[in-house]
Amino acid sequence: MSGWPRPRGAAASVVGVFAVLVLGYAVWAASAGHGRVLGPRVGYGPDSALYLAAARAPVWSRRFLAGPGAFGFLLLAKLCARNVRAIVIVQSALAVVAWVFLATTVASVMRSNLARWIGMVGILCLALAPGVLEWNAMITTESLSLSALCAVLAFGLRLVVRPARRELAGFVAALALFAFTRDTNALVVGGLALIAFACAFRRALRVPALVVGTAGLAFAVTATALSNAAEPPRWYWPVAETTGVRLLADPGATRYIVDHGFPWDAQMRTLPERYIYLYDPVRTGAQFAAFRHWVRVDGRRVYGEYLLTHPGWALRKPFDARDAFFDLGTIELYGRVYRNRPGGVFTVVGTFGAPRSPGFTEAWTVVAAVAFAFLAWRRRIRPALAAAVALIAGFAVIGYYAAWHGDALEVYRHALSAAVQLRIALWIATALVIDAIAIGPTGTETLEPASVRAV
């Protein structure tokens, strides 16, 4: 418990209360609801049915590894015997471990006791926000993805502060779990691998950077290959949705794809702004066969070329829709639909951990970034730690853009990991700013965090 806030007994009590709240919510969602003793308020939608059906297949089969989603959640479902109550309890327990690990790691890299408390409590309150907690009661990939994200960030911070084989091994293992939980996660891992290779030019970082870069690239390539091996490929319907909802709703984009072979006719004119995956004639009807052929043969290539040749559109459109990044309140709709939205104390605590106002979150981002950059420039924050926090925030933005461009359907849900990652970065940055102010101007030796000085 080195580096925990003092008094340590109080910190342990906070962690205990957090665990009770998370697991208590899981038990309630899994065992009570709708007026019956056994009537689970578990989020179970079309994706859930596909995941549980694929989880029946043998682990090494193509149907399992290249199924309807990345196989990480399918493996969890199989280990839980595809029992929805067991899945809720297990992924909630994993969430407790992951969030506590991240919160205590953040506390351990602070020097002042005040900053340790702010970092730890802020992270735990974020985990209790209704828009985050509700996913523990859903039969989807979000909860496991967030737990993997917490593990990646915690091991990453530990690796930056005190490089060691154990931290490196933990970081690589967490990257694997993260990459094989959601397809957009694999893209983020691939980007991280490229940065790791760039860091390998520094002699002191060469070995860990090469290990992270090689492993991350292998995970990203493997996850992408499995996604492409699915039938249809997992990019197929997202590209179709994006074409119908976004590209055909924009005159300029429509002209571009028509010039690149899109079968524009009277039937295609009915597609703009429609969620075509839910429209049976588009999925199977003969009148839309040309559209399905175009998506499979040319769709992904043409869409990618459009983004590359129209960077203004590619950057501006997600920015205009940035509420999906800065607003964690809208996503609570899923909890209301399945009647399992955490209320009461969770709403109060969540308002602190993840403020509901997008405007407030944007202002918090700007103020924290300016203060953090200034103190890092004055070397009041350890350079390696400052770089790590900047990467966390930067990859949150990249993750949001990848989610927005990756699928036009359920953007708030697909951008959840990026939105949570942004708030984690904000809490770490805020704690580090307070830490630097509380400590005041110091010598180089005091830049070592508590977890290192205690050794």
What are these regions (language model features)?
Residues 1-31, 211, 440-441, 448-455:
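Start-transfer (signal-anchor) and selected internal transmembrane alpha helices
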Residues 9-11, 85-94, 314-392:
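Membrane-interface anchor segments at the N-terminal boundary of transmembrane helices
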Residues 30-52, 63-76, 82-85, 295-296:
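Extracytoplasmic catalytic/substrate-binding loops of multi-pass membrane glycan-assembly enzymes
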Residues 67-75, 82-100, 120, 135:
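Loop-to-helix entry region of an early transmembrane alpha helix in multi-pass inner-membrane enzymes
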Residues 89-113, 151:
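Transmembrane-helix motifs of polytopic, lipid-linked glycan transferases
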Residues 152-168, 200:
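Membrane-interface transmembrane helices that cradle and orient dolichyl/undecaprenyl
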Residues 168-182, 213-220:
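Membrane-interface alpha helices of multi-pass inner-membrane proteins
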Residues 229-337:
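Membrane-proximal stem/loop segments at transmembrane-domain junctions that anchor or position
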